């Protein structure tokens, strides 16, 4: 069994650790309102030498991008639409998840200091 671990490094980096590789995602503000720039780096345990190995990692890289663009982002947009559907509603997010609470406290603190 393989485990995928997602680690958020405040404020804008996400590490996704797989059995044989690590993805490093950087999320930065774009030049316009509501624009974001995202970069992805993929690091493998072993250097890809053969054409087959290079194709394998190129395919993994493209798969990661496709999943984020075609699945994760649309899902996130739909969730946000739901949040805005009833702005008077109280929302409890991560009540029993200290990691999420700490992350949001860190964001709030950084915004106060900025």
Predicted regions and their residues:
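C-terminal catalytic domain of Rieske-type non-heme iron oxygenases
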Residues: 1-114
């Amino acid at each position: 069994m393989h485990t995928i671990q997602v680690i958020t490094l405040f404020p804008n980096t996400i590490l996704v650790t797989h059995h044989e590789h690590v993805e490093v995602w950087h999320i930065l503000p774009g030049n316009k309102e509501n624009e974001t720039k995202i970069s992805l780096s993929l690091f493998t345990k072993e250097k890809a030498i053969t054409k087959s190995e290079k194709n394998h990692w190129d395919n993994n890289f493209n798969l990661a991008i496709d999943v984020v663009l075609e699945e994760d982002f649309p899902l996130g947009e739909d969730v946000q639409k739901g949040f805005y559907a009833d702005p008077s509603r109280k929302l409890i997010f991560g009540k029993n998840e200290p990691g999420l609470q700490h992350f949001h406290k860190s964001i709030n603190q950084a915004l106060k200091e900025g």
